[in-house]
Amino acid sequence: MKYPLVPLVNELTFSFLASWLCLPVGLLLFLLIVWLRFLLSQDSEENDSDLCFDWEPWSKGPAEFCQEETLHSPEEERPCW
């Protein structure tokens, strides 16, 4: 039997298949939008002191930055990678 007796997609089944194939994609897109809006609203509620960067360590190498950091604050243990 080369072809099925009843085709899978015809005028009656097209809307049913399209809705069941598009429903998970639409639901995932909706959840992604809600999740991103939630994350953005949490970020704006925090204080803006996190946005102030100290750019001096970026001009140094990682070893110099870690050595200087351990000299200034020996009580804090930070890994040097």
UniProtKB/Swiss-Prot annotation:
Keywords: Membrane, Nucleus, Transmembrane, Transmembrane helix. GO terms for cellular component: cytoplasm; lipid droplet; membrane; nucleus. The chain crosses the membrane at residues 16-36. Pfam families: Adipogenin. It is found in: Membrane; Nucleus. GO terms for biological process: brown fat cell differentiation; positive regulation of fat cell differentiation; spermatogenesis; white fat cell differentiation. InterPro entries: Adipogenin (IPR027938). It comes from the Eukaryota. It is a single-pass membrane protein. Belongs to the adipogenin family. Plays a role in stimulating adipocyte differentiation and development. This is Adipogenin. It comes from Sus scrofa.
